[in-house]
A protein has these predicted regions:
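Conserved N-terminal phosphate-binding loop of PLP-dependent enzymes in the Aspartate aminotransferase
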Residues: 1-246
């Protein structure tokens, strides 16, 4: 295991285990240790190391797929994975998963190849209908531009309030207390969970529901309004002052 954004560690692991690494699997933007963006050159560096050592470059876009762009993080960061994992964002929150990739690898899956894959809920009609509706909405003009506008409004407003760390990528963001910046897992171990719990419950008392863990990403939706965004900012301002966090 290598730390996110630590390309030298990834390189060292490939050198330590020559010919033994089948693939590198990573989130292009982390969502469970805070929202952390890849530093310039990190994703490209991991991809190049994978291909140089005969390994697959696999991106877990369960959180970022259909959130950061129509083409997920790969569109946003101008990079292509060998294989991609997608989750319930593809189906508007209904239970669904999908994977895909380059033809040279996907042709190995049944019925064109020897790798058999099936499951009880594969092709579940309710989830598929949800996915059709989701994709029709997501591909309407201006959806992602609106998400960016709303997200920037919220994040900039929360940063102006102060007293907390706010990091974001597109419509994904998170709030934490303790460190000034988070770029990997080690940084996330410095979170002040006790203070976040107080902030979470104070916001909840005001009718604002955030992820219950400081490490988890929150996401802006296309159905959010400017008035709702402003309410979150105003509420956070009152709570920060009430808790004397700045």
């Amino acid at each position: 295991v290598a730390d996110f954004n630590d390309l030298e560690k990834v390189k060292a692991l490939f050198e330590q285990y020559p010919g033994e690494i089948a693939a590198a699997i990573l989130e292009p933007v982390t969502g469970s240790m805070g929202v952390i963006a890849p530093e310039p050159g990190f994703l490209e560096g991991v991809r190049d190391l994978c291909h140089a050592h005969g390994a697959l470059f696999i991106l877990d876009e369960v959180l970022t797929g259909f959130r950061l762009a129509k083409g997920g993080a790969q569109e946003r960061f101008h990079i292509a994975a060998d294989l991609t994992c997608l989750g319930k964002a593809i189906s508007g929150g209904l239970a669904m998963g999908a994977y895909g990739g380059k033809a040279e690898y996907m042709k190995s899956v049944s019925p064109t190849g020897p790798i058999y894959q099936a499951g009880t809920y594969c092709g579940n009609p309710i989830s598929v209908y949800g996915a059709i509706a989701e994709l029709e909405l997501a591909f309407q003009p201006g959806v992602y531009e609106r998400l960016e506008t709303l997200s920037n409004r919220l994040v900039n407003g929360l940063k102006e309030v102060g007293g907390m760390l706010v990091q974001s990528v597109g419509s994904m963001f998170f709030i934490a207390f303790g460190p000034k910046q988070v770029r990997n897992y080690q940084d996330s171990t410095q979170f002040d969970y006790e203070t976040f719990a107080k902030f979470f419950h104070a916001m909840l008392d005001e009718g604002i529901y955030l992820p219950p863990s400081t490490t988890d990403a929150a996401c802006i939706s296309a159905v959010h309004t400017e008035a709702e965004i402003d309410r979150v900012i105003e509420t956070a301002d009152r709570v920060i002052k009430k808790l004397k966090l700045k």
